[in-house]
Amino acid sequence: MEKYTEIIFILDRSGSMAGLEMDTIGGYNATIEKQKAQQGQAVVSTILFNHYSKVICNRVDINEVKKMDENDYQVYGSTSLLDAVGGAIVHVEKVHKLLGKANCPEKTIFIITTDGYENSSKEFSYKKVKSLINKHDDYQFIFMGANIDAYQVANDIGISKDTTVNYCCDSQGQRLCFNSIDNAISDIRKNGKIKSNSWRAESDNYYNKNTKIRK
């Protein structure tokens, strides 16, 4: 089978995302369109989470991924971050086992965005999610966090600070968040890994500028 990349989006849709619906929808759709133009095959899964997870596409060829709209992305509820991430990893593990080594993706990328702290998971703990992530050198994880200490949360679940970003939870911050996500995916698809910090520069600069203003 021809080599391909699997991209799993795990996107927060809890109540605190209210007001940023169109920015999130637009950012996601723009990222998908940009990735369609990249060389190589890819499949996409997209999970929207609050206190439960909703799958809006499951291993769909990237060229066939439908645009997200307001019916898909409706914000409410609490934040079961651990259940969303842990559940997604376990599902992907099972799928890859069924596919067999010859049919598994060459690269597997998890994109996680959240604008709040974990507050309602029932099935997965920090320890359990960290154990899942630590055993997968073959998976790559990008963690984008707003209104939280993203580095601490990422560390608590085993994600490297090199692939973690604090971003501003406003319209511009959301746009730059998805620009950074697109840069990261493109780098991994092309080079097999993220080769420098340039992918995140816009998000970092905007966050640092606004943090200084608030202080």
Where are these regions (language model features)?
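Acidic, low-complexity intrinsically disordered regions
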Residues: 1-215
